[in-house]
From Swiss-Prot:
<feature type="propeptide" description="Removed by sortase A">
    <location>
        <begin position="486"/>
        <end position="516"/>
    </location>
</feature>
<dbReference type="GO" id="GO:0141129">
    <property type="term" value="P:symbiont-mediated suppression of host signal transduction pathway via antagonism of host cell surface receptor"/>
</dbReference>
<dbReference type="InterPro" id="IPR036779">
    <property type="entry name" value="LysM_dom_sf"/>
</dbReference>
<dbReference type="GO" id="GO:0019864">
    <property type="term" value="F:IgG binding"/>
</dbReference>
<keyword id="KW-0843">Virulence</keyword>
<feature type="repeat" description="2-1">
    <location>
        <begin position="333"/>
        <end position="340"/>
    </location>
</feature>
<feature type="compositionally biased region" description="Basic and acidic residues">
    <location>
        <begin position="318"/>
        <end position="420"/>
    </location>
</feature>
<dbReference type="InterPro" id="IPR018392">
    <property type="entry name" value="LysM_dom"/>
</dbReference>
<feature type="signal peptide">
    <location>
        <begin position="1"/>
        <end position="36"/>
    </location>
</feature>
<keyword id="KW-0572">Peptidoglycan-anchor</keyword>
<dbReference type="Pfam" id="PF01476">
    <property type="entry name" value="LysM"/>
</dbReference>
<feature type="repeat" description="2-10">
    <location>
        <begin position="405"/>
        <end position="412"/>
    </location>
</feature>
<feature type="repeat" description="2-2">
    <location>
        <begin position="341"/>
        <end position="348"/>
    </location>
</feature>
<feature type="modified residue" description="Pentaglycyl murein peptidoglycan amidated threonine">
    <location>
        <position position="485"/>
    </location>
</feature>
<feature type="repeat" description="2-6">
    <location>
        <begin position="373"/>
        <end position="380"/>
    </location>
</feature>
<keyword id="KW-0134">Cell wall</keyword>
<feature type="repeat" description="Immunoglobulin-binding region B">
    <location>
        <begin position="212"/>
        <end position="269"/>
    </location>
</feature>
Length: 516
């Protein structure tokens, strides 16, 4: 078995050796042809790479291609040399920006600003810069030559004389636009005629100057000023009159008269003017403490828009002011639960059981059976002139205008009098309210206090008030009726007292009789 395997291996080895020998013989027979094919392939590859090397110039590229043609067997060496030269000529990284080096950037800028190149020429040079930045200096030199060759001749340049003529013509006030543009165009067409054109323009300007009687004289200036300050003209009307004044100053007086007539015709009607009622509403709304600025401005604008509804606007403003009043409990604010507000259960309120109220059974009330009661034989009986006598004007008399008077608000409300006849104005007070509360007139208060306008008062202001006695004492007599019992004073009180006295006397007599 082993012999058989050895024999097989030997046969395999002989076969391999034979194949190898045959291959070598065949290869040796075709070597020149294979080498030629390899050279052609290397040459083609070198051609392609050299053509696409961006940093070779045309001469260098053509030289390498010629070398490849002359000796294809040296293609690898030629390609290596070309690559080395291409790399050495590559722009440095710190000088690049999209492969545009410093020379290229400078050339770009200069070519873009050459005034005598047309667009096609300028674009052509720029494209050349992009294609081969290494030729920037050469491209720029060529562009400069072309620019200079196309420059206008010296006799067509805008010289100093022409520039001066331009400036003067532009500032001639009496030329119209058409005339001015005509002279400027002539200067552009033939700068050599600048002096003549300027002289001609000056003559025309002077001939068109306004005559002395058409200049802006004093009458025109006055009309200008007055028309500018006519309050009832709109902008279009005002501008129209002013333009007419400019066009023909000799008509200044007529134009001013016409403007005044139109201004008067457009004046607000009398019923729309700020009347006295409106002024009063203005003042009060400005002093309502609980309104915001936006609310106050809104009410004032409404007053301006329609003064005829001043009362309604004021009432609405007051209602809003009261609704926005702070909720803190104090003694001076209307609408709060305090000791001075009418309609509340406190010691000073009318209609409550207190020591100062008329019609109440207390020590100072008429009709009360006490030391101050009418009908009692003492120093405080009715008819005696003392501080507690019914009908006397004191601080506790029914019907007296004081801080505890029925139907009046407390000492911090309008209408309160003090002992000196001075009223301190509170927020929301008006002269009419104060006069009504004190039994006098608004005109009287205005005269006594020397008020220029009786509606112009402010909180904290002290007003002298001329107090008057009530015309009748009906209130005092009414107060003598006791609403709870129906008894009247002093007659009923006297009768009761007399009856008690008679009963006491009868009892004493009966006692003595029994003793006897």
């Amino acid at each position: 078995m082993k012999k058989k395997n050895i024999y097989s291996i030997r046969k395999l080895g002989v076969g391999i050796a034979s194949v190898t020998l045959g291959t070598l013989l065949i290869s040796g027979g075709v070597t020149p042809a294979a080498n030629a094919a390899q050279h052609d392939e290397a040459q083609q590859n070198a051609f392609y790479q050299v053509l696409n090397m961006p940093n070779l110039n045309a001469d260098q590229r053509n030289g390498f291609i010629q070398s490849l043609k002359d000796d294809p067997s040296q293609s690898a060496n030629v390609l290596g040399e070309a690559q080395k030269l291409n790399d050495s000529q590559a722009p440095k990284a710190d000088a690049q920006q999209n492969n545009f080096n410093k020379d290229q950037q400078s050339a770009f800028y200069e070519i873009l600003n050459m005034p005598n190149l047309n667009e096609a020429q300028r674009n052509g040079f720029i494209q050349s810069l992009k294609d081969d930045p290494s030729q920037s200096t050469n491209v720029l030199g060529e562009a400069k030559k072309l620019n200079e060759s196309q420059a206008p001749k010296a006799d067509n340049n805008f010289n100093k004389e022409q520039q001066n003529a331009f400036y003067e013509i532009l500032n001639m006030p009496n030329l119209n636009e058409e005339q001015r543009n005509g002279f400027i165009q002539s200067l552009k067409d033939d700068p050599s005629q600048s002096a003549n054109l300027l002289s001609e323009a000056k003559k025309l300007n002077e001939s068109q100057a306004p005559k002395a009687d058409n200049k802006f004289n004093k009458e025109q200036q006055n009309a200008f000023y007055e028309i500018l300050h006519l309050p009832n003209l709109n902008e279009e009307q005002r501008n129209g009159f002013i333009q007419s004044l400019k066009d023909d100053p000799s008509q200044s007086a007529n134009l001013l008269a016409e403007a005044k007539k139109l201004n008067d015709a457009q004046a607000p009607k009398a019923d729309n003017k700020f009347n006295k009622e409106q002024q009063n509403a203005f003042y009060e709304i400005l002093h309502l403490p609980n309104l915001t600025e936006e609310q106050r401005n809104g009410f004032i604008q409404s007053l301006k828009d329609d003064p005829s509804v001043s009362k309604e606007i004021l009432a609405e403003a007051k209602k809003l002011n009261d609704a926005q009043a702070p909720k803190e409990e104090d003694n001076n604010k209307p609408g709060k639960e305090d000791n001075n507000k009418p309609g509340k259960e406190d010691n000073n309120k009318p209609g409550k059981e207190d020591n100062n109220k008329p019609g109440k059974e207390d020590n100072n009330k008429p009709g009360k059976e006490d030391g101050n009661k009418p009908g009692k034989e003492d120093n405080k009986k009715p008819g005696k002139e003392d501080g507690n006598k019914p009908g006397k004007e004191d601080n506790k008399k029914p019907g007296k205008e004081d801080g505890n008077k029925p139907g009046k608000e407390d000492g911090n409300k309008p209408g309160k009098e003090d002992g000196n006849g001075v009223h301190v104005v509170k927020p929301g007070d008006t002269v009419n309210d104060i006069a009504k509360a004190n039994g006098t007139t608004a005109d009287k208060i205005a005269a006594d206090n020397k008020l220029a306008d009786k509606n112009m008062i402010k909180p904290g202001q002290e007003l002298v008030v001329d107090k008057k006695q009530p015309a009748n004492h009906a209130d005092a007599n009414k107060a003598q009726a006791l609403p709870e019992t129906g008894e009247e004073n002093p007659f009923i009180g006297t009768t009761v007292f007399g009856g008690l006295s008679l009963a006491l006397g009868a009892a004493l007599l009966a006692g003595r009789r029994r003793e006897l």
